[in-house]
Swiss-Prot record:
Lineage start: Bacteria, Bacillati, Bacillota, Clostridia, Eubacteriales
Pfam families in alphabetical order: Exonuc_VII_L, tRNA_anti_2
Family: Belongs to the XseA family.
Broad EC category: hydrolase
HAMAP family the record matches: Exonuc_7_L
Protein name: Exodeoxyribonuclease 7 large subunit
Record's keyword annotation contains Hydrolase: yes
Catalytic activity: Exonucleolytic cleavage in either 5'- to 3'- or 3'- to 5'-direction to yield nucleoside 5'-phosphates
InterPro entries in the record: Exonuc_VII_L (IPR003753), Exonuc_VII_lsu_C (IPR020579), OB-fold_nuc-bd_dom (IPR025824)
């Protein structure tokens, strides 16, 4: 098989896609010593992170740099949280930093990464195992501290979005040695209630030690095996816990978790009104269209109606009758003229008319017309027809 030849840009783009889609590299923590630290005029931070044998170039964009709790310096031993990607123009990979904390929690970081890898390999983070968050939840179970800022944020957001959604608060410790047990009990409690639609597990931001209860392995299994969909709203946007990975939906803050879990009644009412208007317009347009079709059918029926055909035939018959009558009258008149001419001609040649002018018709006893005197003999009888009658005479003498 012939090997495909790649352009430099194609190769860099391919490597970038591979790295960007790697589960570990797209959400990682690394530790080392800061060097070449520089804050750019744009607000972005550029530096290197090194250990005894290696170093990697790092960048922290201004949006993340604003959230730093301290300004790092060259020589600081720190833990970076972020992702690895490739700057395509140079073909160089670098670490895109989202948070910086001073080293001292190295053991916790190692334990976090080990547990994350274990649960990932067991399939607890797989997307196809995650349950869908109900769009119109009526009752939501909230597991958090009853006195913290998180519960206040969740209640305020819920009231603003939909006062009809009921929140059931399960009071739990959210940090400390006994916190995981409380959180697990809360998950199990709401999991077994038929009236609960969604569960929110939440707390405000804090250090890795303060959020460590949400990295508990037993809590991860409890969330994974929960009968209800779970929304994790732990810490701030840059904080990630095992709870975030295993939950059905991760929210960057407790307020955002409430935004996801509680549907906005005003938006729903607006959507319903829009759907009503769309449905009304659709029905109205359909009715108008059907009326047009009906009118077209009525016109077609009128055009093709048998009554129209019959009426047209009556008109045609009347026209034919008038033509026939006209032809008959013309024929009669023509025949009258011919008859008159024939009568005139007949009258002109009628022997009786000739007799009126003094002529007569002479026939012998056998009724033969006598036209010459040679046919007349003495002492015979002849018939003479005159204008007003006929007479029989005897011939006494014939003049030769």
């Amino acid at each position: 098989m012939q090997m495909k030849t790649l352009g430099v840009s194609e190769l860099n783009n391919y490597i970038k896609n591979v790295i960007d889609n790697d589960f570990i590299l797209k959400n990682s923590k690394i530790k080392g010593e800061i060097s070449n630290f520089k804050i750019h005029i744009s607000g972005h931070i550029y530096f290197s992170l090194k250990d005894k044998n290696s170093k990697i170039n790092c960048i922290m964009f201004r949006s993340y740099a604003r959230g730093l709790k301290f300004i790092p310096e060259n020589g600081d031993n720190v833990i970076l949280k972020g992702r690895v990607s490739v700057y395509q123009k140079d073909g160089a990979y670098q670490f895109y930093c989202e948070d910086i904390e001073k080293e001292g929690v190295g053991d916790l970081f190692i334990a976090f990464e080990a547990l994350k890898k274990k649960l990932y390999n067991e399939g607890l983070f797989d997307e196809y195992n995650k349950k869908e968050i109900p769009r119109f939840a009526k009752k939501i179970g909230v597991i958090t501290s009853p006195t913290g800022a998180a519960v206040k944020d969740i209640i305020n957001v819920s009231k603003r979005r939909n006062k009809g959604v009921e929140l059931l608060i399960y009071p739990a410790l959210v940090q400390g040695e006994n916190a995981p047990k409380d959180l697990i009990n809360g998950i199990n409690y709401f999991s077994n209630r038929d009236d609960i639609d969604t569960i929110i597990i939440a707390r405000g931001g804090g250090s890795i030690e303060e959020l460590w209860a949400f990295n508990n392995e037993d809590l991860a299994y409890a969330i994974y095996n929960c009968n209800k969909p779970v929304i994790s709203g732990v810490g701030h946007e840059t904080d990630f816990t095992i709870c975030d990975f295993v939950s059905d939906r991760r929210a960057p803050t407790p307020s955002a978790a409430a935004e996801i879990g509680v549907f906005n009644l005003n938006e729903v009412n607006t959507n319903i009104e829009n759907y009503k208007n769309r449905l009304y317009n659709l029905i109205r347009n359909t009715i108008n269209l059907k009326f047009k079709e009906l009118n077209s059918l009525e016109n077609a029926i009128k055009i093709n109606s048998p009554m129209n055909t019959i009426a047209n035939e009556y008109i045609r018959i009347d026209n034919l009758k008038n033509k026939l009558c006209h032809k008959i009258e013309s024929k009669i008149e023509y025949e009258k003229i011919k008859l008159s001419k024939a009568n005139s001609l007949l009258n002109a040649h009628n022997p009786l008319n000739i007799l009126s002018r003094g002529f007569s018709i002479i026939k012998d006893e056998k009724n033969n017309v006598i036209t010459t005197k040679e046919k007349i003999e003495e002492n015979t009888c002849i018939n003479i027809t005159l204008k007003d009658g006929s007479t029989k005479v005897r011939i006494s003498d014939v003049y030769k």
